[in-house]
Design a protein with these regions (language model features):
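A structural signal for multi-pass alpha-helical bundles of membrane permease subunits
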Residues: 2-294
Length: 294
């Protein structure tokens, strides 16, 4: 029996196919551009190889040479140290954020009282009402508490339960049959063991999905490191500064040329793309049905 597709389904398929092809073309252009070289005097805007060959194949494959120049082009660190700072910042902040959110959501879903309802209301209100103008006060508070310019300080500051992921965890725990908890209590488990040995293992795939999404958010974040971690440059911050011609050695301002910027873009995006490809099924499946599955 042949499957019939409606015109709407066919139209959506064509649109999504064109969108995927468009994104692949852009990624291919980034790779080709990052492999091209720079010739000429940037200060006088003389023609170089890139403007003369915008979309064609590179005459020489210079990607690794460009990366090597970028590695030596910053006045305050190498790419390896920036990558280390990025991993510490992204992994630490993601773990603190997701663990705190998961535990608070479990407690509010398990123990229903006025306080848990207040916490739920605070989360919803903070998502609806934008908080504007608090950045200066937050920076001053971080300095007063000795959290400023410390990666572990950022871990503590990101250890909060506010945001959409609280609602996801809350929905998951709320949908769990109470029989699990009652059976564990009959077997002699206390509240701590019920949480760690029963509830949390049941949401491990939802936890992993949310952790990966939050990790990608922090990996691509350059604003917070720029404001709070001036001595711990991340790759995303390096990309921003390079594109603006900041923190480059005096004789290497040409690194803000497009081929070199695209090479840094690859360094920032390729790890995330690999991570997403490896865990794509886990990401798309568990989070989308996180409120229905235990």
């Amino acid at each position: 029996m042949k499957t019939k597709f409606s015109p709407l389904t066919i139209g959506l398929f064509v649109i999504l196919t064109l969108y995927v092809l468009f994104m692949l073309v852009i990624f291919a252009w980034v790779i080709l551009t990052a492999s091209k070289g720079y010739y000429g005097d940037y200060s006088s805007f003389e023609p170089d190889l890139y403007p003369d060959n915008l979309i064609g194949l590179p005459k020489e494959f210079l990607l690794f040479d460009n990366i090597s120049e970028i590695n030596n082009g910053f006045s305050d660190g190498t790419l390896l140290s920036m990558a280390g700072n990025t991993v510490l910042y992204a992994v630490g902040c993601s773990l603190c954020k997701v663990i705190v959110t998961c535990v608070v959501a479990y407690l509010c879903a398990r123990y229903e009282n006025w306080f848990s309802r207040l916490v739920y209301s605070i989360v919803v209100v903070t998502m609806i009402i934008p908080v504007v103008g608090s950045q200066a006060a937050e920076i001053q508070m971080a300095k007063d508490l000795q959290l400023y310019n410390r990666i572990w300080g950022m871990w503590l500051m990101r250890s909060n339960f506010l945001g959409m992921y609280y609602l996801v965890f809350y929905s998951v725990f709320k949908s769990m049959p109470k029989g699990y908890y009652e059976a564990a209590k009959i077997d002699g488990a206390n509240d701590w063991k019920i949480m760690t040995n029963v509830a949390l293992p049941l949401v491990k795939y939802t936890f992993l999905s949310i952790f990966l999404i939050v990790f990608i958010e922090y990996w691509n974040d350059y604003l917070i490191p720029n404001l709070y971690l001036p001595e711990y440059k991340t790759l995303s911050l390096a990309l921003y500064q390079q594109s603006q011609g900041q923190e480059l050695k005096g004789d290497m301002t040409y690194l803000q040329q497009v081929p070199y910027v695209m090479a840094t873009v690859l360094l920032v995006t390729v790890p995330v793309i690999i991570l997403f490809c490896v865990f794509s099924k886990r990401l798309m499946g568990n989070l989308s049905v996180g409120g229905l599955k235990g």
